[in-house]
Amino acid sequence: MQFVIGRGALQKELSFVQGVVERKNTIPVLANILIESAGENAIRISGTDLDVTIRCDADAESIKSQGAICVPARKLFDIARLLPDAPVSFKREENDWVTVECDRSKFRLPGISKETFPELPGFKSTPLKLSSSSLKSLIDRTIFAITQEEGRYTLSGAKFELDGNGVKMVTTDGHRLAFAAIKEGSANDASTEIDVLIPRKTLAELSKLTSDFDGDIGFGADENHVYFQLGSRLLISRMLSGQFPNYEMVMPKNNDRAATFETGALSQAVRRVALMADDRSHAIRFHLSKEQLLISAQNSDEGEARETVESDYTGDDTDIGFNAQYLQEFLNVVGSEKVTFEFKDGNSQAQLRPVSDNGADYKYVVMPMRL
């Protein structure tokens, strides 16, 4: 196998594929990526951890001989990152060693035969489409609410639903819940409906892929896998098994009080006051009064902080405690000039949402903290 490829093209595709490769593996070949010729003018780069697979095709400047070889993922990426901006020559030698040459640089890497690389899941094409920007928005607005606790398996990913009304993504860690829905990409009939649990790692890698792709994404699912096609790049992920909680039961239905804030002003105030919150609980206090919100935090060792934010609130005075980090993560991605804060009292879950959202439906439910 021998080919020549531009350094930029090689580095870009390696940056995506090596992201799914675990640095420490009990199966040595999984620390490698598979590079193989794909037709007369392209190469294919694949990486997997057996749960998530990314496959990228890249145009080669020339292919002198066809073939395939597995090479260390991280090492090749580090090399490509530091090479000069010049054509890269890649050649498989005898005994499965690989030579990489670029300008005055030359590297030799140990390779592994393709036969030892896991067989990758087959891709089943699907007519379902969703714009890259919409999918990225769904991920960015929900991924932070996925649990970090390894033991809570069914909460370690996002519920991804496609039906006749569009696409929904829901995540929760038991303390908060993020719900994002758009009317784009709806299913034509029951046979194309999707209801799956997608792992956090898959969403993180998918977010990276959408950042470099502007077109429509094709997607679909079978019994065990979900597929996302982004032009010449393909992501295949094993689904999570188990039953996601009934999130509709968590959505508050009797929150009869509401306050609206400038997103930027609220975000900056929360960020500043949180500097004095307890390092473990991140607890801050919201005191709502007529046309004003007082945010405060105190730490017995370091002091206290207070800041007021203008509001349109006209109800009774109310105190509510929140985890500042939970609020900040929502405010970072809400993408609206104003946000509405809906609640019943200081002991019930609150719901935050953007005032204007271009037809999308974004809700963030947060449990209060004891003060």
Could you describe each region identified by the protein language model?
Residues 1-371:
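Structural preference for solvent-exposed beta-strand-turn elements
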